[in-house]
From Swiss-Prot:
Top-level taxonomic group: Archaea
Provenance organism: Thermococcus onnurineus (strain NA1)
Official protein name in the record: UPF0127 protein TON_0581
Family the UniProt entry places it in: Belongs to the UPF0127 family.
Length: 156
């Protein structure tokens, strides 16, 4: 969710963070259906680092540049196969679907806040070991705690 604090306007779409080099490098290139906003967290507030290119983009996008206090320094609808540099230095860039700027009624100087959407992590298979011999003698079932204890001691 993106919020224009100055105007009280809310964009209810999903928000993802591009806070690593690889995520910033990948951006929205080759994404067919842009139905979320991507917030780029840049290492420093500069004009050069905040420039974007639209090479290999499959559709146009709305772009908002923010300074370190999250105030809008520039915004526009970016067209495919072009390069854009903000008017002033920026620390954050928000890229999203066309129409996002209109919903938020963005103007220079507006304060923008975001709430990243939690992404569900994929399950990762973990190798575990079970006792070689399972015995039901003298018990009412399998003692699961014994196998857990064995797994913990193997890792320790």
């Amino acid at each position: 969710m993106l919020v224009n604090e100055t105007k009280g306007r809310i964009w209810h779409g999903r928000v993802r963070l591009a806070d690593t080099f690889f995520k910033r490098f990948r951006g929205l290139m080759l994404v067919r259906d842009i139905n979320y906003a991507l917030v780029f967290v840049l290492p420093a507030e500069t004009r050069a680092n905040a420039s974007i290119h639209m090479f290999f983009m499959l559709s146009d996008i709305d772009v908002i540049w923010l300074d370190s206090s999250r105030r809008v320094v520039d915004f526009k609808t970016a067209r495919k196969w072009r390069v854009y540099v903000p008017k002033k230095a920026a620390r954050y860039i928000i890229e999203g679907p066309v129409g996002m700027i209109n919903v938020l009624e963005v103007e220079e100087g507006d304060l923008i806040r975001w709430s990243p959407t939690e992404e569900k992590n994929k399950a990762v298979p973990v190798k575990i070991s079970l006792p070689e011999k399972i015995s039901f003698e003298g018990s009412n079932g399998i003692a699961i705690a014994e196998s857990v204890k064995e797994i913990r001691t193997e890792k320790a």
